[in-house]
Each structure stands twice: as C-alpha cells, then as structure tokens.
Amino acid sequence: MNIDKIFENPSNLRSFEFNNDVCKVFDDMVSRSVPGYHNIQDIISLTYDEFSQNRVFIDVGCSTGTTIAKILSENQVNYCYGIDISESMLAIAQEKCGEHESLVTFKNCNLLNGTDNVINSEKVPDFIILNLVLQFIRPPERKKFITNIKSLCSSSTLMLVFEKIIFNDAEINMKYIDSYLKWKGKNGYSESEVSNKRKALENKLIPYLHEENIELFKSSGFNSVEICFSFLNFRGYLCRC
C-alpha cells in the first residue's frame, strides 16, 4: 500500500480533488483519516448480508473498490455496480475486483447528470452504499443525488450512509474537531500535514448536522432512519423505505 505523503509538501496547498496522486495513496489516506474505517467496512458487509434480498448492490462513490471487493469475498452476490467520477479510482477498483469481474460493472459517471444506462434492468439493486460521499456533494444538490440513486433501485431499497457531521453546540463541535485532529496525529500525520489538508478541504467537504442528514434521508423517501455507527464526528445511517 502506498503511503499518503501528499500534504507534507506546502506546494500541494490547492483545493482538494480526487486526482491521480490522491488515488495512488487513497487506501492509506482513508484508513488513517476516518475513525473506525475498517469497522465501517465490516458494518457494510454484514448489513448487506442481512438485508439484501436481490443480492444486488450499488456502491456510489466506490473509489478504489475496497468495499465492493470485501462484500464479494465475504457474501453471496448476484451482481453489483461501482460508480465513481474518477477514472483513476475505477482503474484501481477494477484491478482489485478482477477475480469477480463477471459480477461487477464499474461506471465512470456523475449521477447528478442523469441515470440512463447505469444499471441492467434485469439486475436491479436493493442495497445502496454511500460511504463518505454526500459531504462532497453541494448541499442544494444532495436530495437530487439521493433521489437519482434511489430511482435505480427496487422499491424495498435499503441505503447505508456514512458521513462526517457537525454539532449544534459550538463548543462541543470545536472539541470534537480538536479530538479528531489529535486522532489523525496518532495515525502518523504531522501537524503541518493535518493543517494543509484541512485548508485544501475548505468548501470541498461540507458536513451536515446530524438532524439535517435525518431530514434529508426522510425527505428523499426513506421512512426509517437509524444510527448504525458513531465515532467522534462521524456517523453511520441505516435508511429503509
């Protein structure tokens, strides 16, 4: 696994994007930047196994395909879809899932622009994965994004979402941010790396309040929303129609 050293260099202080350099180190970056990341992978795989009836799922923002590869290796899967806007990410995902290539289709597309020809009508998913994706979608477009994804799936779809959040209480919010930054330091990032990445993510990663996420999911057609993961300022949501 390539080690993330992107933000060691101050010259990389530009707006964050999932370019080729980020893709090369993404697996290391996300495991050292998201508290409980490996637990999140376990939750996704176990929840899929319990809830998916069709045994067909769609991972939107699949990045390097880690989640897809895990589900394929641990569960019965009839088919799955990996969607991402980064061709570099998808190239890695295809290689990672190579031994299961007959069971997966990868698509380079932005579902905000439409959903034509994304899935096979005979292989309809009933399980949606949105792992740390919505926070990178502009707030006014999030409901449309979810609605478009939901339109691809069966009427009994379950959606699993993981997001970074903010808190109503300003003091609690700042203390949890400080705790999160300390946690990243314990994972080998220097203070300058943490600071540089934080600046690069400004106006790119926009977290919602917990209550805003609940309202978003319910207004998008999910009647039941439950918490399935909580660690510092990260939450997991189990959303059911």
Swiss-Prot record:
Instruction: Identify the coding gene.
Output: cmoA1
Recorded catalytic activity of this chain's protein: prephenate + S-adenosyl-L-methionine = carboxy-S-adenosyl-L-methionine + 3-phenylpyruvate + H2O
Function statement: Catalyzes the conversion of S-adenosyl-L-methionine (SAM) to carboxy-S-adenosyl-L-methionine (Cx-SAM).
Keyword terms: S-adenosyl-L-methionine, Transferase
Question: What's the short name of a Pfam family annotated to this entry?
Answer: Methyltransf_25
Q: Which residues bind S-adenosyl-L-methionine?
A: 37, 61-63, 131, 198
Q: Does the keyword DNA repair apply?
A: no
What superkingdom does the record give? Bacteria
Judged by the first EC level, this protein's enzyme class is: transferase
Looking up InterPro entries in the UniProt record yields:
CmoA (IPR005271), Methyltransf_25 (IPR041698), SAM-dependent_MTases_sf (IPR029063)
Among the GO molecular function terms of this UniProt record, one is:
carboxyl- or carbamoyltransferase activity
Family under the similarity heading: Belongs to the class I-like SAM-binding methyltransferase superfamily. Cx-SAM synthase family.
Can you state the subunit structure given in the record?
Homodimer.
Instruction: List its EC numbers.
Output: 2.1.3.-
**Which species is this record about?**
Yersinia pseudotuberculosis serotype IB (strain PB1/+)
Query: What protein am I looking at?
Result: Carboxy-S-adenosyl-L-methionine synthase 1
One of the GO biological process terms: tRNA wobble uridine modification
